[in-house]
Each structure stands twice: as C-alpha cells, then as structure tokens.
Amino acid sequence: MEDNFASVVESLSGTSASALPLLTVSPADTSLKAPETKVQETKTEEKKPPKKRKSWGQELPIPKTNLPPRKRAKTEDEKEQRRIERVLRNRAAAQTSRERKRLEMEKLENEKIQMEQQNQFLLQRLSQMEAENNRLSQQLAQLTAEVRNSRNSTPKPGSPATASPTLTPTLFKQEGDELPLERIPFPTPSITDYSPTLKPSSLAESSDVTQHPAVSVGGLEGPGSALPLFDLGSGVEHDAANDIAAPLSDDDFHRLFNGDSSTEPDSSVIEDGFSFDILDSGDLSAFPFDSMVNFDSEPVALEGIEPAHGLPNETPYQTSGLQPSLGASTSRCDGQGIAAGC
C-alpha cells in the first residue's frame, strides 16, 4: 500500500506541468441532487376476498337456536341467529325509510303542483290588474283633459237667473264691505199665515167696530137697521171667495158715514166726533147697538174661501163663541156707567 502511494507521488513529480490535464468544475456538478429512492410496494400475498352483496329478497335460513336478546352469542349457531335478526331489522328499517321518503316526495309533488297553479292564477290576476290600471290611467287622463278644457272655455251668456232672496248679496257680507242696515230686507209675515180662519175683511171689520161705532140711519133700509160698515159704494160687490180687504183710509170712512150723499162727503163727523144730538135727549141706551152684532148660533159658512196653507187648524170659528155668557148684559157698558143698563 505504501509502495503504491510512493510510486504515484514519484510519477506526479516527474511529469511536467504542461503534461497534467486541467481540471474544470461546472456549476451543475456542484448542485445538490436528492437521490432517487424507489419505493417498493409490498404486496401482501394474503388478501381478504371482497364481501359479496346478497341480492334483495333472499330467503334467510331459519335460526337453529333461540338465544335471548341480551345474551352474548358464543357458538356459531347463536352468531348465525344474531346475523339473521340483524338482517331482518335492517330490512324493516330500510322499508320504513323508503316509505317515509315516498310520502315526503308525494307531499313535495303536491305542493309543487299547488304552487304552479297558484303562480298561474297570480299571473292571470297580474295581467288583469295591469289592464285595469291602464284603463283607469286613460280614463283619468281623459277626465283631466275635460276639466282643463272646461276651465279654459268661457261660459256662454244665457238668460239672467232670477235673483233668489236667499242668495242675494245683501244676505252674505263679504270681507271689507260695509253694508247698511236699511239695505237688508226684513220681510214681514202676513197675519193670515198664523190664523187659518181669520180673513182680512173680518179683521178690518172688528177693528172698525171697536174704533168707530155704527150709526143708525132711519129711512134707508127700514127702522132699526144699521148702516153696513163696508158699504163703500153701489158698484163694489163683495165676493166671499175673493174677499181681500185693505185697511180703511180716511176717504173710506167719509163714504161710510156719508153714503147717501152724491156730493163731496162732509168731514165734520170725523173732525168733530160723533154728534149725540141725533139721539133723543142724548140717551145712548136708545141707540140700537144690538142690531150690529150677529147673535145667531149657527156657524158662518165659509165654503169657497181658500184656507191658509201649511197650518194644522183649518176649522172655522163659530159665531156662537162671540155671544155673551149667561147673565151678561147685551147692551153697551163702559167704565163710566153711561148706559142705563149698567
């Protein structure tokens, strides 16, 4: 060994430098490379055979033993019994699971059908509502256009409407208007609206009887007759159906007391008052006041006279209500006791 080493050294020292080969190192040679390890797969010679799946509905053998449920199986027959019981339990559980899944699928199918029908119905309703909405929008636009045209168009001049008493400007005062009281109409209701049987002629007659006593004029109609109160002339006819009398004026009173005079009536009676010289010795008891009052108990026939409308009581009053009570004097009595009968 030592001899070989010495010979190599001598040979190297004896050779020239030019004869020695140049050693070069590439970068690829300096890189580290992992050694390739080949993994050898160990194949086990003893492999278990694959478990063969038994077909569905295979008849199971009848167990030879009758092992209680909670007892451990020890023998091969007992283990076979446990296997058969396990297979039966699995078959029952699988059947129950399949039935449950079938019911769930049927329920889902029914719900799907119902949802499809409801979706179809809602789509139809949506189309109907859209059509209705479009129709209403068109109608609204048409009405808006009509209202706008009616506002822009000027009204045609027509016949002037009659002024209504309830719509006159005098009844509704506007802001900033000063309305005097004399311009506001205050209608006075007629007295015939409150009394259904009271006539204007009877009202005027009753007022004239109390204010101007009747004067008996002899020789006109006969002895003891009184001058008619409303004898205003021979050309005036009293119609019961159209008896609308006005209050008597001074000229009417002049014609009343001077009815037989064709010339201008004498106003001395009105100016000087009633003359008591026409009576015998100025006795008022001799004046026939009873002839001027109708004491007839029969009611006055008011047929043909239009009653007042809108009043509940339309029965005429009887003249018997004007008769004095039993024991009262029928002659004129005053507070001074002028009449003899008082």
UniProtKB/Swiss-Prot annotation:
GO BP annotation list: endoplasmic reticulum unfolded protein response; positive regulation of transcription by RNA polymerase II
UniProt xrefs under InterPro entries: bZIP, bZIP_sf, Hac1/HY5
Superkingdom, taxonomy of origin: Eukaryota
UniProt keyword annotations, A-Z: Activator, DNA-binding, Nucleus, Transcription, Transcription regulation, Unfolded protein response, Virulence
UniProt region (Disordered), positions on chain: 1-105, 146-167, 306-330
A GO term from the CC aspect: nucleus
Compositional bias (Polar residues): 315-330
Annotated stretches, region: Basic motif: 82-135
Cell location: Nucleus
Phenotype upon loss of function: Leads to reduced capacity for protease secretion and impairs growth when challenged to assimilate nutrients from complex substrates. In addition, exhibits increased susceptibility to antifungal agents that disrupt the membrane or cell wall and shows attenuated virulence in multiple mouse models of invasive aspergillosis. Affects the expression of only a small amount of genes. Leads to hypersensitivity to agents that block calcineurin-dependent signaling. Impairs the UPR-dependent induction of spfA.
Annotated region described as Leucine-zipper, given as residue ranges: 136-143
Keyword Transcription: yes
Domain (bZIP) ranges: 80-143
Major place of residence: nucleus
Pfam families named among the record's database cross-references: bZIP_2
GO molecular function, one term: DNA binding
Bias (Basic and acidic residues): 35-48, 74-88
SMART domains: BRLZ
Family indicated by similarity: Belongs to the bZIP family.
Protein role: Master transcriptional regulator of the unfolded protein response (UPR) that recognizes and binds to the UPR element (UPRE) in the promoter of UPR-regulated genes. In the canonical UPR pathway, the ireA RNase splices the cytoplasmic mRNA hacA, which alters the reading frame to allow translation of the bZIP transcription factor hacA. Induces the expression of pmrA, scrA and spfA in response to UPR.
Name the record gives this protein: Transcriptional regulator of the unfolded protein response hacA
Source species taxonomy: Eukaryota, Fungi, Dikarya, Ascomycota, Pezizomycotina
